[in-house]
Amino acid sequence: MQEQYRPEEIESKVQLHWDEKRTFEVTEDESKEKYYCLSMLPYPSGRLHMGHVRNYTIGDVVARYQRMLGKNVLQPIGWDAFGLPAEGAAVKNNTAPAPWTYDNIAYMKNQLKTLGFGYDWSREIATCTPEYYRWEQKFFTELYKKGLVYKKTSAVNWCPNDQTVLANEQVIDGCCWRCDTKVERKEIPQWFIKITAYADELLRDLDKLDHWPDTVKTMQRNWIGRSEGVEITFDVKGYDNTLTVYTTRPDTFMGATYLAVAAGHPLAQKAAANNAELAAFIDECRNTKVAEAEMATMEKKGVDTGYKAIHPLTGEEIPVWAANFVLMEYGTGAVMAVPGHDQRDYEFASKYGLTIKPVILAADSSEPDLSEQALTEKGVLFNSGEFDGLAFEAAFNAIADKLAEKGVGERKVNYRLRDWGVSRQRYWGAPIPMVTLEDGTVLPTPEDQLPVILPEDVVMDGITSPIKADPEWAKTTVNGMPALRETDTFDTFMESSWYYARYTCPQYQEGMLDSKAANYWLPVDIYIGGIEHAIMHLLYFRFFHKLMRDAGMVTSDEPAKQLLCQGMVLADAFYYVGENGERNWVSPVDAIVERDEKGRIVKAKDAAGHELVYTGMSKMSKSKNNGIDPQVMVERYGADTVRLFMMFASPADMTLEWQESGVEGANRFIKRVWKLVYEHTAKGPVAALNVDALSEDQKALRRDVHKTIAKVTDDIGRRQTFNTAIAAIMELMNKLAKAPQEGEQDRALLQEALQAVVRMLNPFTPHVCFTLWQELGGEGDIDNAPWPVADEQAMVENTTLVVVQVNGKVRGKITVAVDATEEQVRERAGQEHLVAKYLDGVTVRKVIYVPGKLLNLVVG
């Protein structure tokens, strides 16, 4: 064994061994308990960042630990390879998205291997290959036949100059990111999958997910947004149709003083024909961003349509306004307004001088003061005719019943969740497998024409999708009739909604999934990824699993038993102000800092001498130039050090502060382990451990070893507090480094201890542990070695620490046998020189003994 720890030599050698031996390749094995450990698959952006490294290190630690428990562990990896960034990069680099993507995959795959992650590479998937997306296309056509897919017009961001649809993130301050033209809202036909058909089950089954974070479950509950209310129909004077609204507060119905409809509502459109102000307002609404978050904060505006609705219970005429806060795609495109008891309605009514009618009493049973704001709390009704005096629940039921009796209302459960729009007007995605015949009939692409392959050899102009620009691509025939293919592509959330299942059978050619393999491995035992995916990806992931279950492919109801959301990685951020007042962000690597005695940064400059402003720690990002390149760190310290720091610096679900001093600390610790193993093995062969022959000190050290095994096992396996597991191993290492190494049993005990330490560290630092295990004469490869088991006998405390007091003051501590009598404890206390001097020449008048804990001698 060489004396110096040289990670650059060890790591490449061990990685080559894993590759050649195919150590982490697995197949279904009914004789073994399975464990499926999955980290969210990366987008091949070009380089790994520290967020990736953290996510994948956590996954690898769990997978290697479970493997050492003797389980059949599947840990796959792949690439979420479609998406918008590839289109931008292709235009910028004058290439096509496909070669750019495949180059990135090759580069990042090498980076993952350099970090020593134990993946089954035989199952690698890239979602942009026809071998993958063909099954997604086929499944979509089956969902269409089941009635779970439909097409309808829906609002998108449209750039009139480029004649193209923009993603929300491509709209900057209401303008096109490319040509700065004012963006419009345009209604175009798009494909939807009926996730709302599964809303109740998606909500209900959250209760089965005991090992998912409550925050994620709450976010999904709110997103699905189940509510119980009443749907009410209003007649409108001079308008052919009725207006339908939904409310969760029918108790306030007698206070409804106006209705509001979306600018795109047929009633508003009709009224605009002879109302120029309304027509202009509708036009303005077309350019409003469609995101819900924007809706909440934007100024509420409206125009009176001139129509009057008839209140179904009072017969009063109430005005119908067109308002920018009502969206056509939400509910019926019309809402009932009760300004006395809803703050948004109140602000709108105050702005436009509309009637505000209170119908709920304040908590003290007085009439509410509505001079400043609405009273939104529930309470007792007044000003409501026959319903006066009823509290919320009774009023809800009485008014709902009355409306139903009159045939103008019905109770209804509503969901905030909307159907999933899967159409994207982009090129780099899987083509949607639908065709349109010349007579307008829409059909799914026949199975013998699947997959609909996306051409990869294209020229990008940065404006139009190549498959939209080429009229020939869309032409096809169905049953001998000419037809046109759909030129939209799937939302990339489609690919990431079922990849976890395809990993169980990536080479399967007979269908989307091989049920036998899928049901052996699924559900996923632990799924690791960022909390930013809480609603979109993790909801679609659950939805797709239920679709596959109902298609007979899987038997479980949910895709993953446990979800672990890792925290973000933060780093110092610095900038200097440029000549034009702009902020120039400087990488923390290039900042020369001065710190105070507490280690806080007080001053910083860069190599060019700019005074830097330190903004504290923030998430590593391109915008703040504070990302640390994992590759540089691996080259400087080795992959094991980077992995150990990542797992030690913070609990897995909390933010991690990147500190190079911490990385250096992790590196020093690995060197200490290496040094101790080197010194130990240099002394030659070791005798067998004879537990019965150990001295009290040796027994105490062995007790520490086995207590550490028990703690680390619990920390990794049950609590998943990986940082405390590492801390416990470090504490044990300090004791081992101080332990005597001369006697035969000293060395035998150290051999047992070091073999345990190396196995416990293996999930975190697998390269160095692979090597040290061999040096310590471990059997076979450490990758196949069992996890150390704590010896219950060794952990039994056969001695205990008793505190000795004289007249109530602590004068010493003594170690005695657990079963020592009071007499023996007194005798032992008298021999303790710190205690003995207080007993000299005095009489012990009383003895208070708490067995195994305290001896108090009262003297006089």
Curated annotation (Swiss-Prot):
Its EC number is 6.1.1.4. It is an enzyme of class 6 (ligase). A motif ('KMSKS' region) lies at residues 619-623. Keywords: Aminoacyl-tRNA synthetase, ATP-binding, Cytoplasm, Ligase, Nucleotide-binding, Protein biosynthesis. A motif ('HIGH' region) lies at residues 42-52. It is found in: Cytoplasm. One of its GO terms (biological process) is leucyl-tRNA aminoacylation. PANTHER family: LEUCINE--TRNA LIGASE, MITOCHONDRIAL, LEUCYL-TRNA SYNTHETASE. This is Leucine--tRNA ligase. It comes from Salmonella choleraesuis (strain SC-B67).
